[in-house]
Amino acid sequence: MKEKNQVVPDEVLSKEFLSQFKTEADVSKFLKQLHAQVLEKMLEGEMDAHLGYEKNSVTGNNTGNSRNGSYPKKIQTEHGESVISIPRDRNGQFEPIAVPKHESRGLSIEKLVISLYAKGMSVSDIEEEMREIYEIELSTSAISIITNKVNQAAQEWQNRPLGPVYLIVWMDGIVFKVRDNGKIINKTVYLCVGLKQNGLKEVLGMWVGKSESSSFWMGVLTDLKARGVQDILITCTDNLNGFTDTIRSIFPQSSTQICVVHQIRNSCKYVVYKDKKEFTADMKNIYNAPNKEVAATELDNLEKKWGGKYPYAILSWRNNWDDLTVFFQFPLEIRKIIYTTNLIENLNGKIRKYTKSKLSFPSDDAVKKTVYLSLMEIEKKWTMPISNWGLIMNQFMLMFENRIQI
C-alpha cells in the first residue's frame, strides 16, 4: 500500500476548515499567510535563543538586553510577496538566520545549516539548534554532509580568477590551533586583501601554513600571479625578513610599506606598561609627520628621550626606516589608507568573532572551511567604497597613470 504523505493530520483538515477554500487562489492565499506566520514564529524562537529567555519572562529582568519591538520586511516566496515582522533587540545585536538581513528569501534547510556553521557553531550545536528552535530533526551525519559541501565552494573561491591590477594589497595572518599528526599545534591562516579600482575591498585568498617565511609568501604571490594579477601598486606587510625582496621578485614595480601598526606593537614589546602610553604618543609624532624629513627628526627625538631606557624599541625603527616610510611618497589621503586603515587587524577580529566557539580544529580543511564561511559573511557588508574615493582614485591615477587602466 502506498504510504500517505501527511504533513497535516486529517483531524485538522475538517470539513469546517476546508469550507473556507472555494478556489485554488484561496488555497494559495492561505499558504502565503501560513508561510509568513511560520517564519515569524521561527524568528521569535531565534530571538528567545539570542536573549536566553522567552517573551514576557521575568528571567529576562536586568539581563542587559531585551526585545525592542519589530520592523516590517518584504520577502519573496513561491506564493508571492509577503510582509513579515522581524523582531529586534535593544542592543541591536540580533542577527536573524531564517530570514537573513539584506536578503528577501528565507533560507532552505541546507542554507540554514551552513549559516549556523558560519556563525561558529559545531555540528552537535547545530543539531540541537535545529531541533529546539526550528523543530527539525537532522542527524549529525546529515549536517556534516551539508557542511562538507562548503569545501568545494571554498576551493572554487580560492582558485577563482582575479583582476589584473590592485591598488593596495594587505598581507597578514591569523593563528588557530589545529590538530596535526595527533598533536594540537599553532597554524596560521594567511590572508591577502586587495583594494580594487572601484574603492571596494576583496579578500584575494587564504593559505594555511605552520610558519611564516619568505619562501611561503613566494608561493602565495606566485599563486596570485597565476590567477591573473599582473600588478600591485602598493603592498602592506609585516616586518618579515626578506619579504620585500620576495614581493619585488614577483611584482617588481610594487612599493612595499611595512605595517606601522605591527611596528608600533613590536616596539611596545620592549617598553614597560607604565611608559607605554607616553611612548606610543611620542611614536605617533613619527608617522603623523608631514614628510619623511620631519619624521626622521621625530625619530631622533624619540631616541633622545627613550633610547637610553629602551634601545631595542628604537632599533627596529632604525633598521626598517626606508620600508616604514614609503607612505611619505604619497598624498595624505593615500597615506591614511596605507598606515591608519588597520584593515587586516579589523578583518582578523571579525573572523575571531565567528570562530570564538572553536577551541581547536580537527584538520586544515576544517579551519579553511570555517574561515571561508566567515569571510563570505564579512564580505557581504563590504558594499561601499573607501571614504573620499573619488579624490583618492584621482591621486592614484596621477601617480600611476601608466599602470592603471580605466
Segments the model singles out, each with a brief description of its role:
Residues 234-241, 246-284:
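Conserved beta-strand -> loop -> alpha-helix junction used to position metal-binding or nucleic-acid-contacting
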Residues 105-109, 278:
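Alpha-helix N-cap/N′ positions at the starts of helices
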Residues 124-135:
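DNA-recognition alpha helix
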Residues 108-120:
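Short, amphipathic alpha-helical "recognition" segments used to contact nucleic acids or chromatin
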Residues 3, 252, 285-406:
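Acidic/histidine-rich catalytic cores and adjacent linkers
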